[in-house]
Amino acid sequence: MALKNFNPITPSLRELVQVDKTSLWKGRPLKSLTKGISKTGGRNNQGRITSWHRGGGHKKLYRIIDFKRNKIDISAIVERIEYDPNRTAFIALIKYEDGEYSYILAPQKLSVGDRVISSQDADIKIGNCLPLKFIPTGTTLHNVEMKVGKGGQIARSAGTSVDLVGKDSGYAQIKLRSGEFRLVPLDCKATIGSISNPDQKNINLGKAGRNRWLGWRPHVRGVAMNPVDHPHGGGEGKTSGGRHPVTPWGFPTKGKKTRKNKRTSKFIVKKRK
């Protein structure tokens, strides 16, 4: 996929950079693989904001993605590559030999007409899904399971992938894009290749309104608030906050480590950079 630049006939077009989607499917998604999705506005079941700066945005249908790839030893053909408003990666509609349809995350270089399969005997080919114990070291992977049968959780965002760097004592060692080395059970499944749409990181929305279409509201700085709203608020004139950066609740931010899951720390061989 290439990037699109625009002639600056309006101010918002001057900086706009978008991913060229001309090769994607232009129709509607397969109705049987979609469902409605309700907006939360960043609120939880008590009506309190738990995710700030969310709200509004264009109405969307949720595409049901097969992260588990549980249809074993049944080949499927790629019918089309589609845009998905719920994620940064593109998705592929595949049709199995028994007639069933499914959506999967589209890896780079997967084309219409290609065949994919989930099997321990599958070839090491883009889009095929295998248990890690049958994948050779050095292979680039995406949609990697962390728990057997739970479905892929690692490397699902646009352009991402992990590298299989070793196998030992029932675990595979994978290298994440963050620089982290992690252990994953060898019976967990992963898909060959890296995720589509690697140019997502180079886009420029061009104007605030386009962010609103995506469901993001304005991010107000703490120093622009009143003292009642934020520890950085208040002061005469424009002040810098007068203390080290903190959250609205007074906890250190901007680099403070927040990970607290000691139970799974034993699976992290090397921490992220």
UniProtKB/Swiss-Prot annotation:
GO cellular-component terms in the record? large ribosomal subunit
Q: Where is this region: Disordered?
A: 228-273
* Listed SUPFAM superfamilies: Nucleic acid-binding proteins, Translation proteins SH3-like domain
Question: What is one GO biological process annotated to this record?
Answer: translation
The entry's keywords: Ribonucleoprotein, Ribosomal protein, RNA-binding, rRNA-binding
Biased composition annotated in UniProt, kind: Basic residues? 254-273
Q: What's one Pfam family the UniProt record gives for this protein?
A: Ribosomal_L2_C
Gene Ontology molecular functions: rRNA binding; structural constituent of ribosome; transferase activity
State the oligomer form and interacting partners: Part of the 50S ribosomal subunit. Forms a bridge to the 30S subunit in the 70S ribosome.
Family statement: Belongs to the universal ribosomal protein uL2 family.
The free-text function statement in the UniProt record for this protein reads:
One of the primary rRNA binding proteins. Required for association of the 30S and 50S subunits to form the 70S ribosome, for tRNA binding and peptide bond formation. It has been suggested to have peptidyltransferase activity; this is somewhat controversial. Makes several contacts with the 16S rRNA in the 70S ribosome.
Name of the featured protein: Large ribosomal subunit protein uL2
Q: Which organism is it from?
A: Rickettsia felis (strain ATCC VR-1525 / URRWXCal2)
The taxonomy runs: Bacteria, Pseudomonadati, Pseudomonadota, Alphaproteobacteria, Rickettsiales
Q: Which gene encodes it?
A: rplB
